Structure formats: C-alpha cells, structure tokens
Amino acid sequence: MANRLCTLLLIGLVAFPLHAKEIKPVYMLSSSTPLDNPHDLKLSPNGRYLFVADVGNNRVAILDPDSLAMIASFGSDHQSGTHDIDFDAVGRAYVADTHNNRVTIYDIDDSKARLVGELNERIRGPEGVLLHSNGRVYVAGAWSGNVVAYQDGRVVAELTGLSSPHDLEETADGDIWLSDSGNHRLLLLSPQLRIKAELGRRQYNFNGVRYLDLLDDGTLVAGDKNNHVIKFIAPDGKMLLVLGSGKPGKGANQFVTPEGVEVRGNILWLSDSGNDRIVKYRLD
C-alpha cells in the first residue's frame, strides 16, 4: 500500500521538479501583538497586510507583514472561533467562522471589512476555506467531517468520511492539498474532490497536521501541531526539513502547537498558536 501511495504522489505532482533545493529557514522576528491562539494567516492580495485568524479573540487581526505590529481587526462583534481566511479574485475575504457553522464573506477596503454574505450549507465547524482559481469556494467542515465545494453559493461537490479536516491549498496545476487532521494525513484532491494521493502518518509521523502552504517549486510546508514542528516535504515526497525540536518551547525555532502557514516569495510566516504569536522567517 505504501508503494502504491508513493506512486500516486509522483503521478499527481509531475508538474514540479522532482528534487527541491535545500531550504534554510532564518529566524527574523516574533510578534508582540496580543493574540489568543492564532490559527491560519494570509497575506492580502496586494501584500500590504497580513490577516490572522485570531481564534480566542473571535476576530481577524490585521498585522503589518514586515514588523508584525497590529494595524486593525474585525469580526469580534459577530464571529466565534475564527480559524481561517482566504481571498477571491476581486479581493473579498472569506472567513471560517467556526463556532457559528459558517463562512462569512467581506468586502475589504484597505484595512476595513464589511460583512456582505455567508455560506453555511452542509458544513459544521468549518476550519478551512480555499478560493480556487476555478471560481469555486472549498470549505473543510471539521465537525461535519467533509469538504464542500460551492459555486455561485450552491453546493456542487462534496467529499465525506474525513476526520476533522482543516486546511485546503491549491497547487500550480489546480489540484488541492487537504489536511485530514484527525486521520493524521494530507490528501491530494482533484477539483472534483476525488482523492489522488495520500501522505500518511506512517511515512511522515504526522500528529494532528493542520495548516499548509506551498513554495514556488511545489514543496509543502505543514504545521504538524501536536509534534510542535513545521515540516517541509518535497514534490517527490522526500522530507526536506523539520523545523522545531519536537518539544514545546518558546524562542527561535521552537513552537507550541503551531498551526498557520503563509509563504510569499522567500518569506514565511507561522502561527505559533500555543505561544500566542506570529513568527517570521526568511528562506535562504
């Protein structure tokens, strides 16, 4: 079975080079902004702001991506257990409003947000949201154990039988990586939500793997929450790097239950959730 999964992985990722270059994360700084269990995070489309799902404060915190200073926030008057955020092609923000069993939709004007809609059909406890280049919205229902695809506000596809699914990230060729957290694995899905490949606990020692992002060469960066590390996995399935000691700690290259991951160019932002901070790295 393991060999079959490895073969599927390679078939699913042939668009990328088979050997990624060596990665050297260089610690830059940590936030001092008062956050409470921050989860996933996303740069605004123009790169000006870093939007952080601030779970314990029931809001989205907006930080300066360079200094990690707080600029603004929104949602604390109506969100509950905010877990994830993504943007569509025209800059609207979609937020996983987890404890309210919905994804809230906002028009964004600079650092101001206006609630304009929501998605809630067939999902409970959404913790991941992806705005795909095909125009669909993919939502991971952590409590409902499913992934739902919406088009024009209607459900058009669904994958069930999952365990606390979390993040969804689009690959260069339009496939989707999903963290099936309760099953301690990553799944590669087609846009129609068919499973194409699996990276499992046996091969990668995942323990509650959570949020993800992709480097330009297709390398996966994954927050392996309960192992207190960040894992870098090459397109050919090779483990390139484990960042962190594997024990809870605070400081450079130390984490407590890290979750959120965002990459832009050679800059990496991480949500060190158990330490209530955002950490910034340069990838050399």
Show which residues each predicted segment covers.
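Bacterial N-terminal signal peptides
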Residues: C6-A15
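A short beta-strand motif characteristic of beta-propeller blades
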Residues: P25-S32, A69-G75, K112-L119, R154-L159, ...
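Beta-rich, blade/repeat-based domains predominating
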Residues: S32-P45, D77-A89, E121-S133, G161-A172, ...
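Conserved beta-strand positions in repeat-built beta-propeller and related beta-rich domains
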Residues: V52-G56, V95-N101, V139-W143, L178-H184, ...
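Short loop/turn segments that connect beta-strands within beta-propeller blades
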Residues: D64-L68, D107-S111, Y150-R154, S190-R194, ...
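Blade-level signature of beta-propeller repeat domains, shared across WD40, Kelch, NHL, RCC1
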Residues: T257-D284
